Amino acid sequence: MKPAIFLMLFVAMFLISEGEGFKPKDAPQERSVFSPVVQSCPRCHRRDHFGKCRKLDPCPDK
């Protein structure tokens, strides 16, 4: 029964990534979520829980 749970979890993660506008050319950036090497985001961007860089509306200038 446990393998079925992992399979369902994998399918759910895949569907979530599809809903986020996943494209094959985005694969290296998507894969960086699970790798120890994390690329830095541009200025005024922050990394969300999907690992993508999101632009901040009120840009906090450092």
Curated annotation (Swiss-Prot):
Disulfide bonds join 41-53, 44-59. Belongs to the Hau1a/HC18/HC19 family. GO terms for cellular component: extracellular region; nematocyst. This is U-stichotoxin-Hau1a. It is found in: Secreted; Nematocyst. Residues 22-31 form a propeptide. Toxin that is lethal to crab. Does not produce the typical symptoms associated with sodium channel toxins in crabs, suggesting that it likely does not act on sodium channels. The keyword DNA damage does not apply. Residues 1-21 form the signal peptide. It comes from the Eukaryota. It comes from Heteractis aurora (Banded sea anemone). Keywords: Disulfide bond, Hydroxylation, Nematocyst, Secreted, Signal, Toxin. The modification Hydroxyproline is found at residue 36.
